[in-house]
Amino acid sequence: MVLDESSWDNDHSPCYPGGLHYADDKIDAFLQGSTQYDALGHLWYGGKIWNGYDARTTVGGLDKASVAPIGERGVVGRGVLLDMARHRGKRMLDKGETFTHMDLEACAEAQGHTIEPHDILIIRTNFLQAFYEEGEAFYDGFCEPGLTYSEELVQWFHDKEIPNLVTDTIANEVTTDPVSGVALPLHCALMRNLGIAFTEICDLEKLAESCAKDRQYTFLYVAAPLKVHRATGSPVNPVVIK
C-alpha cells in the first residue's frame, strides 16, 4: 500500500478541497508467478521462437510473440475439464506420473462427452495440493505429473486444432520426459511449433467439484490476460460459465 490514512500524518500528504482522503496500492510481481498465460515467445530452441522469428527478438523484451496479442483478443471458447485425478481414482496424481492423449480421450469418455476440434483443454491433476501440504519439501526431486511427449500426441493436438492447454500445474506437462530425459518438450512441440497457448497454475478444485456433481464437463471458457507490452506472460483470472 502506498497511501492510507497514516499518509496524512505528515505535511507532505496530498491535499484536496473538501478534505478527501484515499488509499492506493501498487503491485510488484512476477508476471508468471500465479495463474497465468505464457506468451508464444516464452520458450524456444534452435535459435528460433514461435513462427520462425529469431530468438534475438527476445532481448530486452519480446519484439515478437509477446503476450499482448493474446490480451488484445482474449480467449473465448468451449472448455472441457478432463479430471485425470478423479478418473484415476486418486486425490492427486503422483510426482512424475504421466498420461497421453489416449488417456485424455478415455477420461472424456468416462465423463460422458467427447473432445471436439477447437476445444480448450483443462486438465486437473490436483498436484499443487502437495505444495500446500508439504511446503518447501514440495520441490525436493521436483517432477510434476502431466502429459508426456510423443509424435502421436503432437499430431493429435494438431489434428484437433486445440488452441489453449490449461492445467493446475506449473508447467502443463511432466517436468522431465521419462523416455528422453528432456525438460519440457511439449513447451517446444505444442507452444513453439504449433502456437498453442499455455495457461498454468489454475485452481480447478471448485470447478471439478461442480462438474462431478452435475456431470457437466463442458462449458464456456473466457480469459483476458493483461496487455503487457513485450511481456513473456501475464496474470489472468479465467472464468467458466456452465
Identify the role of each PLM range:
Residues M1-K242:
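Active-/binding-site microenvironments in catalytic and ligand-binding cores
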